[in-house]
């Protein structure tokens, strides 16, 4: 009888998720608490930093979006984060809080718009490459690209992405659905051939010009020279006295941290990392 009761409860929980999303009651309660608490913050609060810090010490777990091999579902998981889902959750919370929204459904809808091209929940529309993530979220009016022809943006990235289509076995859902491959190739073709100015590793110092360029709470995309990829890691900018640090879901520390090392020193330990691109959350209150 007890086993049957548990089974019924589990089924109820699954159906309560709806047809398009996975989440737990804990996730829903946490999101609504965070959004309610944010309404009490001073108006000039840096919401990206505030919400990012609410996830400090949350465990790093990869592949949390690939729960259903049959079809893509919107996953809300605040208990386990990777570098991308950390940034997406923080951005979604920030945009909701700016609009004064406090309901989980508001957050869920915003996260869907951030994570998927044109907000359509499909594996081939998930913004797997962060270059396309930036382009799409800028087009949607959620972020602005921070770039310039001048210092410290002294280098240019020529994007050539095909890692997913060339390494299908590394992606469980894609390997299970070879019919999705053409959609992934189409996604890769959108950004392949594009050029973007970026801040090279050597320019990521504690200078006045860098402090003027990068603001607390900016989204930092670390670029890579690894063949077929555009970026290797993302996080949120945090300025401290000794320089620029990265708040991120770290596979090294196995949790969300503000990296103790300054970003330049961190990147020097990763020879394949060549520099950074930036985007900044739009201030909806000014629009």
Say what each PLM segment does.
Residues 7-16:
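Bacterial N-terminal signal peptides
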Residues 17-26:
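Bacterial Sec-dependent signal peptides at the C-terminal "C-region" and cleavage site
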Residues 27-46, 65:
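Start-of-domain marker
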Residues 60-197, 239, 247-251:
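Acidic/His-rich structured neighborhood in mature extracellular/periplasmic domains
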Residues 198-210, 224:
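Short alpha-helix capping/helix-loop boundary micro-motifs
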């Amino acid at each position: 009888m007890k086993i049957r009761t548990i089974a019924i409860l589990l089924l109820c929980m699954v159906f309560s998720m709806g047809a398009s999303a996975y989440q737990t009651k804990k996730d829903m309660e946490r999101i609504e608490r965070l959004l309610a608490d944010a309404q009490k913050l001073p108006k000039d609060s840096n919401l990206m930093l505030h919400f990012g810090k609410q996830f400090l010490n949350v465990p790093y777990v990869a592949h949390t979006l690939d729960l259903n091999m049959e079809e893509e579902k919107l996953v809300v998981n605040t208990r386990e984060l990777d570098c991308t889902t950390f940034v997406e959750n923080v951005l979604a919370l920030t945009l909701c809080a700016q609009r004064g929204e406090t309901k989980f459904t508001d957050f869920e809808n915003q996260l869907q718009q951030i994570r998927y091209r044109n907000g359509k929940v499909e594996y081939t529309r998930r913004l797997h490459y962060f270059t396309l993530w930036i382009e799409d979220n800028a087009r949607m009016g959620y972020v602005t690209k921070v770039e310039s022809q001048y210092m410290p943006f002294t280098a240019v990235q020529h994007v050539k992405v095909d890692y997913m289509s060339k390494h299908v076995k590394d992606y469980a859902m894609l390997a299970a659905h070879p019919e999705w491959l053409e959609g992934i190739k189409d996604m890769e073709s959108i950004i392949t051939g594009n050029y973007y100015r970026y801040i090279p590793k050597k320019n990521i110092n504690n200078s006045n010009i860098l402090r003027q360029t990068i603001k607390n709470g900016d989204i930092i995309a670390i670029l890579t020279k690894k063949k077929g990829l555009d970026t290797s890691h993302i996080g949120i900018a945090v300025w401290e006295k000794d320089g620029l640090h990265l708040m991120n879901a770290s596979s090294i520390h196995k949790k969300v941290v503000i990296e103790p090392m300054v970003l330049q020193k961190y990147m020097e330990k990763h020879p394949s990392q060549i520099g950074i691109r930036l985007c900044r959350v739009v201030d909806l209150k000014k629009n």
